[in-house]
C-alpha cells in the first residue's frame, strides 16, 4: 500500500537525516506528488486525532471537526510561512520540496507526540515536544538547504514560536467569541 510505503520511507529518511547520512533525500518523494501524498496523510492523521480526542465525549459536529483539524494544522501553516519568509529574506530560491515534504512527515509525528504528552501528563510537559520539533526542523534546514547554523536555528525557532503564537491567538479569539456580551 502506498501510504504505508510513504510512512516507512519517511521514517527511514528521518533516521538517515538525523544520523547525518546523505542518502536521506532518496527516502522522500521530493516533488508535487510527494507533497500531495504527505499532505493527504497529514490530513488523515489530523482527522484521526480529532476523532480520538472526541471518543470520550459526544460525537462532534462537522464544524467542530473542521475547527479541530484547522487548529491541528497550524504547525504545517507555521512551517510553510516561516520557510517562505526565510527564503524571501535571504533572497534565495532554495529547494522547497526538500523542506516541505520531510517537514510534513515530522509534523505528523509532532502532532501525535504532542497529543500523547498532553493527554498523559498535562500541559507543561508539552514544551518537550516543542523543543523536539525545533531540533528536527533545525536538522532539516541544515541538511536540506545548506543554510548556516544561525539561519537554520532561526528557521526552527521562528517556526515553533509562530506555532505557539498562532495557537495562543486562536485560543484568545475562541474565548472572546464564546463569552457572553
Where is each model-derived feature located?
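Short, charged low-complexity intrinsically disordered segments located at boundaries
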Residues: 40-49, 114-118, 170-172
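A short, structure-level motif marking secondary-structure boundaries and short turns
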Residues: 67-68, 122-124, 167, 180
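Residue-level signal for alpha-helical context at structural boundaries
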Residues: 32, 36, 57, 61, ...
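Hydrophobic alpha-helical transmembrane segments and adjacent short intramembrane/lumenal linkers
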Residues: 83-162, 168
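Juxtamembrane boundary at the C-terminal end of a transmembrane helix
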Residues: 165-181
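Low-complexity, flexible helical/coil segments
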Residues: 52-54, 121, 178
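Selected alpha-helical membrane-embedding segments in polytopic membrane proteins
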Residues: 2-95
Amino acid at each position: 500500500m502506498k501510504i504505508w510505503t510513504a510512512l516507512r520511507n519517511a521514517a527511514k529518511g528521518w533516521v538517515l537525516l538525523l544520523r547525518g547520512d546523505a542518502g536521506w533525500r532518496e527516502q522522500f518523494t521530493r516533488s508535487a506528488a510527494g507533497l500531495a501524498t504527505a499532505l493527504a496523510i497529514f490530513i488523515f492523521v489530523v482527522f484521526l486525532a480529532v476523532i480520538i480526542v472526541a471518543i470520550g465525549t459526544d460525537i462532534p459536529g462537522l464544524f467542530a471537526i473542521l475547527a479541530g483539524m484547522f487548529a491541528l494544522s497550524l504547525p504545517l501553516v507555521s512551517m510553510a510561512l516561516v520557510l517562505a519568509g526565510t527564503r524571501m529574506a535571504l533572497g534565495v530560491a532554495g529547494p522547497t520540496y526538500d523542506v516541505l515534504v520531510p517537514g510534513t512527515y515530522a509534523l505528523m509525528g509532532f502532532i501525535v507526540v504532542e497529543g500523547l504528552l498532553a493527554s498523559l501528563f498535562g500541559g507543561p510537559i508539552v514544551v518537550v515536544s516543542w523543543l523536539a520539533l525545533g531540533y528536527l526542523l533545525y536538522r532539516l534546514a541544515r541538511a536540506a538547504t545548506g543554510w548556516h547554523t544561525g539561519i537554520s536555528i532561526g528557521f526552527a525557532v521562528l517556526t515553533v514560536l509562530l506555532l505557539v503564537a498562532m495557537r495562543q491567538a486562536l485560543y484568545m479569539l475562541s474565548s472572546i467569541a464564546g463569552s457572553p456580551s
